[in-house]
Design a protein with these regions (language model features):
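Acidic, PIN/NYN-like endoribonuclease modules and their adjacent C-terminal/linker elements
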Residues: 1-3, 71-75, 103-133
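A general structural signal for well-ordered alpha-helical segments in protein cores
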Residues: 21, 46, 62-65, 82, ...
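Acidic, metal-associated active-site segment
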Residues: 8, 49, 96-112
Length: 133
């Protein structure tokens, strides 16, 4: 079974029809067709997506977003995740808190982290990173 943790940028690329978003859409489609893929997003990244969508023409309610991402688990950002994110800041101080929340969740689940942020290519944090564009 493959495991994916989405960064906010990957989800936004799909919703806003930006380059790289088609890969997220394909992963969601495959899961709905029975392909075994475990997908998750940190509650921090969920908040980032909702915040960005409130300010864009593609305004979606939290319920509409949940429907689009029905196969994606929203994982609460708790103490263990915060501690991992803090460790990641020592290895990659240029990565934001939201990005570190994604990487910490991917690390804890032994999953690939999907993002559109090219800066992540420089993050050597022991997580498989897929840069979608």
């Amino acid at each position: 079974m493959s495991r994916i943790v989405f960064d906010a940028s990957a989800v936004l690329a799909m919703i806003l029809k930006e380059r790289g978003g088609e890969r997220v859409e394909m992963a969601l489609d495959q899961t709905s067709q029975g392909v075994a893929t475990e997908m998750a997003i940190s509650s921090v990244n969920w908040c980032e997506v909702l915040t960005k969508l409130q300010r864009s023409p593609a305004s979606l309610t939290p319920e509409e977003l949940a429907g689009i991402l029905s196969g994606v688990e929203v994982v609460p950002f708790e103490r263990s995740g915060a501690e991992l994110a803090a460790q990641i800041s020592l290895q990659a101080p240029f990565i934001s808190l939201g990005d570190r929340a994604c990487l910490a969740l991917a690390q804890s689940r032994k999953a690939a982290a999907w993002t559109t942020d090219k800066l992540w290519a420089h993050a050597k944090v022991g997580v498989s990173i897929e840069i979608l564009r």
